[in-house]
Amino acid sequence: MNNILVINGPNLNLLGKREPDIYGNITLENINQKIKLHFKNEDLRIDFFQSNEEGKIIDRIIESEKKYNAIVINPAAYSHYSIAILDAMRSINIPVVEVHLSNIYKREEYRKKSVTAEASLGVISGFGYYGYIMAIEFILNNLSIGK
């Protein structure tokens, strides 16, 4: 069985309330349910983690290598400046795919750069919750995980 960890960063617990014109009305819990439902027939365990605290995200990334085959991460605002999260991502030997709900390249100038992308296999941006599904599909179909 493959084990994938989905990490969500700061303020994503506010989805459904925060800036619905950008993020829509879907909640993080709804996103997690849609992901689980999409992969219900796969031999796959998906765990979800969300924190507004950088240190907790770093700890979870570092610990993930013991339990998971891959990570899907939405670092949210931390993607634009957290060298600490970048370093944690670089320190592990499992694949990481970065996801953003909105198209960061259509946003404010300071949101157009993702420092964490440097440690990601790829970045999926602008497809809403479906970006998480795309990331997991990529991991399952293109990487030799759990073998």
From Swiss-Prot:
UniProt xrefs under InterPro entries: DHquinase_II, DHquinase_II_CS, DHquinase_II_sf
Annotated site, Transition state stabilizer, chain positions: 18
Highest taxon listed in the record's lineage: Bacteria
UniProt EC number: 4.2.1.10
Lyase among keywords: yes
Catalyzed reactions per annotation: 3-dehydroquinate = 3-dehydroshikimate + H2O
GO molecular function: 3-dehydroquinate dehydratase activity
Pathway: Metabolic intermediate biosynthesis; chorismate biosynthesis; chorismate from D-erythrose 4-phosphate and phosphoenolpyruvate: step 3/7
Alphabetical GO biological process terms: amino acid biosynthetic process; aromatic amino acid family biosynthetic process; chorismate biosynthetic process; quinate catabolic process
Classification via PROSITE patterns: DEHYDROQUINASE_II (PS01029)
Record's subunit section: Homododecamer.
Protein name: 3-dehydroquinate dehydratase
Biological source species: Clostridium botulinum (strain Loch Maree / Type A3)
